[in-house]
């Protein structure tokens, strides 16, 4: 006779299986996981060796053990040895400098002032925590004794927060962490504000470039009206107009070694003017496109020009020969500067890079790629071995000879066309929107912002600064602007540190984004 099997739902069968499984292991539910003594010892040994290895086992001589004991309450911590049961390992107990109280924050009472032997559980835990020593470790451990302390512990003073912690082991010294002084931001030097002193008009187009002659008697400007004009610096009156370029004049410079004026323009021409006869005596041919800037070497008769053809050229002033063609930029070279020290030539380009060149070899020494936008201006500090570059993203300061980055000067959010700096550390940046910012060179503090009004007869949109320069006495600042004028600024003689205080707060961390 076939026995009928009672049918159950899947849900019931699953729960019955779960119950059987639970009943099978129910005895182990409340049982703790057994402790593996060997692995626990190894774990504690590794932790102690990593964290307390240099100070846990310090070698000492038997004579020092006999002579030196804990002298006073200021001695260092000591290792005490307590005998264990026969046939077991020696157990160590680490005691503090005082027999009482047993821990921080414990009140001193009749009960806590008594120094007790460690309990069995405490001694067992300490014994487990001690590392397993190899033979090499055993050779350098201290000999058995009632107690010992580190050599020289009582001789050294208690370290303060600003002192270094030194542990002496025989004749060697292991220096531990030394507290460092918190970094401080230098306070910017106070500079008097600059105010508009004079506006000079006479050009019929944008004034694109400006230069002051070494004698500080006159200055020269070049304009989009294709003329070069020479002005009296003291009175601001026009002295002379020179014609010869057939397009915008983009750069002018006066030689300190001879009575020559050099100019360049968008007509690809580079001209040398003899100021005794007021005429062109030399042409320098070679550029394939507009010439954007030029500079003279301070110690040798060498002229350097930069162009929209992505090259800079080095010319012999006397022979008109092209000594080197500095190629490497991938876009128009907007600015060039020369100095007597290495590197002698610095160029900034619309390809966002700055290159430092070897004048003798005509090759690139360093390429700086930190800027993200076109570099239209570069200026060298007259005293420090540093320079600055201007770009629409920010102004950056660099250190020669390798172009090490110093700091960012952020805040002039415009296309920066020109930079100039004087020996007092006043950096001036002029932008295409007509704003001019003045900075402290050392700290990068922006102490003044100027936006001169557009002159009558010019459109409001014609607001832009294309060039600026200090005169030789550094008491006047001249700017060449898009409203066809030259503006002259002077320091405010009535300003003091009380009337115009430095509104500066130190930053916690100076941002040095590349």
Curated annotation (Swiss-Prot):
Disulfide bonds: none annotated. InterPro entries: G-protein_beta_WD-40_rep (IPR020472), Prp46/PLRG1-like (IPR045241), WD40/YVTN_repeat-like_dom_sf (IPR015943), WD40_repeat_CS (IPR019775), WD40_repeat_dom_sf (IPR036322), WD40_rpt (IPR001680). GO terms for cellular component: catalytic step 2 spliceosome; fibrillar center; nuclear membrane; nuclear speck; nucleoplasm; nucleus; Prp19 complex; spliceosomal complex. WD repeats lie at residues 202-241, 244-283, 286-325, 328-367, 370-410, 411-449, 460-499. Its main location: nucleus. The modification N-acetylmethionine is found at residue 1. Residues 135-160 are annotated as: Disordered. This is Pleiotropic regulator 1. The keyword Coiled coil does not apply.
């Amino acid at each position: 006779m076939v026995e009928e099997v009672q049918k159950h739902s899947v849900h019931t069968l699953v729960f019955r299986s779960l119950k059987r499984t639970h009943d099978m292991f129910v005895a182990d539910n409340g049982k703790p996981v057994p402790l593996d003594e060997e692995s626990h010892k190894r774990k504690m040994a590794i932790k102690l060796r990593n964290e307390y290895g240099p100070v846990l086992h310090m070698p000492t001589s038997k004579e020092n053990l006999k002579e030196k004991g804990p002298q006073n309450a200021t001695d260092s911590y000591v290792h005490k040895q307590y005998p264990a049961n026969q046939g077991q390992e020696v157990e160590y107990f680490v005691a503090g400098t005082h027999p009482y109280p047993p821990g921080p924050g414990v009140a001193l009472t009749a009960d806590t002032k008594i120094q007790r032997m460690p309990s069995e559980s405490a001694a067992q835990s300490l014994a487990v925590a001690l590392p397993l020593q190899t033979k090499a470790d055993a050779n350098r451990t201290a000999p058995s004794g009632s107690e010992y302390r580190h050599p020289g512990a009582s001789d050294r003073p208690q370290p303060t927060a600003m002192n270094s912690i030194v542990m002496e082991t025989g004749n060697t010294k292991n220096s531990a962490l030394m507290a460092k002084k918190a970094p401080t931001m230098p306070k910017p030097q106070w500079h008097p504000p600059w105010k508009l002193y004079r506006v000079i008009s006479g050009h019929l187009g944008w004034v694109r470039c400006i230069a002051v002659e070494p004698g500080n008697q006159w200055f020269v400007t070049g304009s989009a009206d294709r003329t070069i004009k020479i002005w009296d610096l003291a009175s601001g009156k026009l002295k002379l107009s020179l014609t010869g370029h057939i397009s915008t004049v983009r750069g002018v410079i006066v030689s300190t070694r001879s009575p020559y004026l050099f100019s360049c323009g968008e007509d690809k021409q580079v001209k040398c003017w003899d100021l005794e006869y007021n005429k062109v005596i030399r042409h320098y041919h070679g550029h394939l496109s507009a010439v954007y800037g030029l500079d003279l070497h301070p110690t040798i008769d060498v002229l350097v020009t930069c162009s929209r053809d992505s090259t800079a050229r080095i010319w012999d002033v006397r022979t008109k020969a092209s000594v080197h063609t500095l190629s490497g930029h991938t876009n128009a070279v907007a600015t060039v500067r020369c100095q007597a020290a290495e590197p002698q030539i610095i160029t900034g380009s619309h390809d966002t890079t700055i290159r430092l060149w070897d004048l003798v070899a005509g090759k690139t020494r360093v390429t700086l790629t930190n800027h993200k936008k076109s570099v239209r201006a570069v200026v060298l500090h007259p005293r420090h071995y540093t320079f600055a570059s201007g770009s629409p993203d920010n102004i950056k300061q660099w250190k020669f000879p390798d172009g090490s980055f110093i700091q960012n000067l952020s805040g002039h959010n415009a296309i920066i066309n020109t930079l100039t700096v004087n020996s007092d550390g006043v950096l001036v940046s002029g932008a295409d929107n007509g704003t001019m910012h003045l900075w402290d060179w050392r700290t990068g503090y922006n102490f003044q912002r100027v936006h001169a009004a557009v002159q009558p007869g010019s459109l409001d949109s014609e607001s832009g600064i294309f060039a600026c320069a200090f005169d030789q006495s550094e008491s006047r600042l001249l700017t060449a602007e898009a409203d066809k004028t030259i503006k002259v600024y002077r320091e405010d003689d009535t300003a003091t540190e009380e009337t115009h205080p430095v509104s500066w707060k130190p930053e916690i961390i100076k941002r040095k984004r590349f």
